[in-house]
Regions:
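Polytopic transmembrane helical bundles with strong interfacial aromatic enrichment
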Residues: 1-132
Length: 132
């Protein structure tokens, strides 16, 4: 798969992951799908970071991809805590705070992933033009 397609894939998977958790009527099976997508996004974020480091892409893109991978790692930790609360019945203090942080990080991941995907695509196609 071309690098730009792979970078956009994480954006759409993150979007799908956010959407799955917002559909309450479909129940707990969507929580499992949400969790599975989280692990896929984690793997892709780290893979994208490694693959970007092998290119001549600007260092800024590499740094953003690295921070996205770090956020995805932290996101999984929060996700496991929330999963234990929702599916396993483990009582978690301040679960609302954890949920809010989980949401904020999800939005940061999708934003950063979109930024990297667009910038890499433009860099690869030499679409940058000097300002006048």
């Amino acid at each position: 798969m071309k690098m730009w397609k792979q970078l956009y894939l994480i954006v759409w998977l993150a979007f799908l992951q956010i959407i799955t958790i917002l559909i309450p009527r479909l129940g707990s099976s969507l929580v499992d799908l949400h969790a599975t997508l989280g692990f896929v996004i984690l793997g892709l974020a780290h893979y994208d970071h490694v693959m970007l480091n092998r290119t001549q892409a600007p260092n800024r893109l590499k740094r953003i991809a690295k921070s996205t991978a770090v956020l995805a790692t932290f996101q999984i930790i929060l996700g496991i805590i929330l999963y234990a609360n929702l599916r396993l019945g483990v009582s978690i203090p301040l679960v609302e705070v954890v949920t809010f942080i989980h949401l904020v990080i999800a939005l940061a991941i999708i934003t950063q992933a979109a930024s990297v995907a667009t910038a890499f695509d433009m860099w690869e196609e030499h679409e940058y033009t000097p300002s006048k």
